[in-house]
Regions:
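Transmembrane signal-anchor hairpin modules in multi-pass inner-membrane enzymes, especially those
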Residues: 1-80, 178-181, 230-240, 403-445
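Helix-loop-helix junctions and helix-breaking kinks within/between transmembrane helices
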Residues: 36-47, 88-94, 161, 187-223, ...
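Hydrophobic alpha-helical segments of polytopic membrane proteins
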Residues: 70-81, 177-268, 356-357
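Interfacial loop-to-transmembrane-helix boundary motif in multi-pass membrane proteins
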Residues: 104-128
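Membrane-interface segments at transmembrane-helix junctions in multi-pass inner-membrane proteins
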Residues: 134-180, 205-206, 331-335
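Long extracytoplasmic/lumenal interhelical loops at the membrane interface
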Residues: 279-339
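Hydrophobic transmembrane alpha-helices and their immediate junctions
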Residues: 338-372, 404
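Transmembrane alpha-helices of multi-pass inner-membrane enzymes
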Residues: 368-372, 382-420, 445
Length: 445
């Protein structure tokens, strides 16, 4: 018995075992979550069994390996308690599962989570794309009233055209975040081409815009990086670095308020939607009637504290249009109406904490802004098959914005003649290794 206790203690003290447990549950759940967005046949019973298995594995990881401070423990307990009340009040299990996935990612490398997410999405979506073109699974084609006669919107193996486009957007977003330092001009041109193809074949306007903005944001960031590295003369570097830090702060603030901003805009546009208002009606038509449907939801169901059961029937899985179609696409209004104002507040606070925790990671801030824009119209904010950014709350996510030797902190140093120069920390240490502690001091944080 003592031997088993020692083995157990030894096993639970190894953090790698906890990481392995997380990825076991993560992969099982993600596989079936992504599969459900495709036209591949899948069994509901098998999905439920895998769901239960992944919940057990992730809960085991939390109980055996995770250690919290008192404040974080209270916060985590509050998140679980709120999601459990939402489950009882509305009957929806997904908020509880979302919280479980986030909490179980504690101390797991964020980069590794994104890599596995990206690999699984590329593999499954790639197979679905090829299978749909070969006729193995159905390639759903829809005729849109906005398109010319004879023009079709294709789903390429997904349950709907916008789902395919959303997968492409989130895969590109993840890949750009992971491999930001390897991006070149042809990647940005390729992103614009993909944006055009998504518009032409899927007519997914939101994801077309988001993919284009993705290339634009990262290209601009790349230019700023290149500019800051181009010269190391003090009179130029100092000014450029200050400008770079100013933009960095702007991204940080915008990311922090982006979800509150876009959520508020969508709520009031929906609340005050009237057909007679030409401006709002134009917006409604541009986003295919989403304001009208959201207003119906607000007036019919209202906003509750802990959520309510709201039947929704959307497009997808078939080319037949349901007669009782009703679906709220905006993530903000979807969460607010279905899961309640308290859980909606928790989601907003979580992303605010992610922004604060990773405020040195400008690329993550840009990614969250793009996510906030996308979720204004799409409902994928809490959908793990699409959005992987929420894991940054508890996962190990250090700043990836700057590589070695490209820090924004400047140092001033004096040589033997009394002249001073400004340079990056690494450059100063390499130039004056014997005097770096004595003669170097930071002049710009």
């Amino acid at each position: 018995m003592d031997f088993l206790i020692k083995k157990y203690n030894s096993w639970t003290k190894n953090p790698q075992n906890g990481e392995n447990l997380f990825f076991a549950g993560f992969i099982i759940y993600m596989f079936w979550s992504i599969m459900r967005t495709t036209m591949f046949p899948h069994s509901g019973m098998v999905f439920n069994m895998c769901l239960v298995l992944s919940v057990v594995i992730l809960a085991t990881k939390i109980f055996l390996f995770d250690v919290y401070t008192f404040k974080i423990f209270i916060a985590v307990a509050g998140m679980f308690a709120c999601s459990a009340i939402v489950l009882v009040s509305s009957g929806y299990f997904w908020p509880f599962l979302w919280v479980l996935m986030l909490v179980s990612a504690k101390d797991v490398p964020f980069r590794k989570i994104l890599q596995i997410y990206l690999l699984m999405n590329i593999s499954i979506m790639g197979l679905a794309f090829i299978a749909s073109l070969l006729g193995v699974i159905e390639n759903l084609a829809y005729i849109s009233a906005d398109l010319d006669k004879g023009m079709y919107r294709y789903s390429f193996g997904c349950v709907y055209t916008t789902d395919f486009a959303a997968h492409i957007f989130f895969m590109l977003l993840t890949a750009f975040y992971l491999y930001q330092e390897k991006l070149r001009w042809y990647h940005y041109i390729g992103t614009c081409v993909i944006s055009g193809l998504i518009y032409y074949f899927c007519y997914a306007k939101l994801d077309t815009i988001c993919i284009f903005l993705l290339g634009l944001f990262f290209a601009g960031y790349h230019v700023l990086q290149w500019q800051s590295k181009r010269e190391k003369q003090v009179l130029f570097v100092f000014k450029r670095t200050r400008a770079h830090i100013r933009w960095k702060k702007i991204w940080n603030v915008f990311a922090l308020v982006s979800m509150v901003l876009f959520g508020t805009v969508m709520y009031f546009l929906s609340l005050y939607y009237e057909e007679d208002n030409e401006f709002i009606e134009t917006i409604n038509e541009t986003i295919t009637g989403r304001l009208d449907l959201a207003k119906i939801g607000i007036e019919k169901y209202g906003i509750t504290l802990f959520g309510q059961n709201i039947p929704m029937v959307g497009m997808g899985g078939s080319t037949k249009s349901p007669k009782d179609y009703f679906f709220i696409d905006s993530s903000y209004l979807f969460i607010l109406l279905r899961y309640g104002i308290l859980f909606f507040g928790i989601v907003i606070v979580i992303y605010g904490l992610i922004c604060y925790k990773n405020r040195g990671d400008t690329v993550l801030m840009m990614s969250i802004i793009l996510l906030a824009i996308s979720c204004s119209i799409d409902h994928h904010l809490l959908d793990e098959a699409y959005n992987p950014l929420s894991y940054a709350l508890f996962a190990k996510a250090g700043s990836m914005a700057w590589g070695r030797g490209t820090e924004l902190k400047l140092y001033q140093m004096w040589d033997d003649s009394g002249r001073w120069q400004a340079c990056g920390k690494e450059d100063c240490q390499q130039s004056w290794p014997a005097r770096r502690h004595k003669n170097a001091r930071g002049i710009l944080e």
